[in-house]
Amino acid sequence: MPAQRLITFTTDFGVNDHFVGTMKGVIYQINPAAQIVDICNGVNSFDILDGALTIAQAYKYYPAETLHMVIVDPGVGSARRPLLVTTGKHIFLAPDNGVLSLVYEREERLSVRHITAG
């Protein structure tokens, strides 16, 4: 069985449709032991700065090895590749659009990788 993993969501999806629930369902199919916490699904639509401020204020309060999924992207569906960013303590998955810019400013140790298919 996969290891238990704490995963946070910071999105502009809102809570009036199926998108957040669908994402959680996919994660639980892959790892039924995952724990998912919503930091905020009410980031202003397509507002990268609002998303950046939200995750920057919250992530530091979570345990080491938490995976933070930050999905605020006015270019969704474009050719923009997602990023996998690791710091000394945290892991981030987000679009390459600046939504993690404040995390970059606060963390000294960063590894940034584009995720590609294959």
Question: What feature does the model see in each segment?
Answer:
Residues 4-6, 30-32, 36, 46-53, ...:
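Active-site histidine-anchored catalytic micro-motif
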Residues 58:
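Short HxH-centered metal-ligating active-site micro-motif
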Residues 4-45:
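N-terminal glycine-rich anion-binding loop in soluble enzyme alpha/beta folds
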